[in-house]
């Protein structure tokens, strides 16, 4: 067995379920779930229609890269949404559809981290649990960037010592952040990019709340 499995922490939503067990909301009040980011609105009709119209394809495996149409639509949307300008994203080289962000965020660490060089993987705290789990199973040590009220619930890159940056191989970033809702500014993003260029680490920018 992989000994790194012993380093994993209990999944927080299992702990939350245990904490909520036996809790009954007051009569007449509808509880609002603030845990897993699950859509609370009905699926738009045009999506349901598109899916039901392709049910015959459920018997076959899709391509790993996704269809050219999907990749092109993703690249076009991203280019417009984030103002990437001429060229934008190359749908052939820079777009890879995945089954939810968890899969991609985990794979980043497995692909990037060299466990033989005492690596650090940095992440905000509080954080999405997969950041820590991916780092641990890649053989890295998680390095937590505390999101404190004094710092406006944003990571303080200036507080990280130079030795930590030199050991860093991957930084997980979530902006807009969950659960704080804060957005990292352009100057802070540019600083992180400059640090990545200087110390040769990868930034995994988790932007699942951008909309």
Regions found by a protein language model. Give the residues of each.
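A short helix->loop->beta-strand "cap" motif at the edges of active sites that frequently abuts
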Residues: 119, 198-202
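Walker B catalytic acidic pair
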Residues: 207
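Aromatic/hydrophobic pocket-lining residues that form π-stacking "cages" and hydrophobic walls in ligand
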Residues: 16, 20, 131, 192, ...
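Short catalytic/ligand-binding loop motif for oxyanion handling, primarily in non-cytosolic enzymes
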Residues: 41-44, 180-182, 199
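Helix C-cap/helix->beta junction micro-motif
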Residues: 23, 138, 198-199
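Conserved core of the PLP fold type I
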Residues: 59-194, 210-211
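Walker B beta-strand of ABC/ABC-like P-loop ATPase nucleotide-binding domains
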Residues: 172, 203-204
């Amino acid at each position: 067995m992989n000994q790194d499995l012993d380093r994993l922490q209990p999944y927080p939503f299992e702990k939350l379920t245990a904490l909520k067990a036996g809790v009954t909301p007051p009569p007449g009040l509808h509880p609002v779930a603030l845990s897993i980011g699950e859509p609370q609105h009905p699926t738009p009709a045009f999506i349901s229609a598109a899916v039901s119209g392709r049910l015959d394809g459920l018997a076959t495996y899709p391509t790993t890269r996704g269809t050219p149409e999907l990749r092109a639509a993703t690249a076009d949307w991203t280019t417009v949404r984030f103002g990437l300008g001429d060229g934008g994203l190359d749908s052939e080289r820079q777009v890879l559809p995945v089954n939810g962000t968890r899969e991609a965020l985990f794979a980043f660490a497995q692909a990037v981290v060299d466990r033989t060089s005492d690596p650090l993987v940095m992440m905000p705290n509080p954080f999405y649990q997969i950041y820590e789990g991916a780092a641990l199973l890649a053989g890295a040590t998680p390095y937590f960037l505390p999101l404190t009220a004094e710092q406006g619930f944003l990571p303080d890159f200036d507080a990280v010592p130079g030795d930590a940056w030199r050991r860093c191989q991957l930084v997980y970033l979530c902006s807009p952040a969950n659960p704080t809702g804060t957005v990292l500014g352009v100057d802070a993003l540019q600083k992180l990019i400059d640090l990545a260029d200087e110390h040769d680490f990868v930034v995994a920018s988790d932007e699942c709340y951008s909309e």
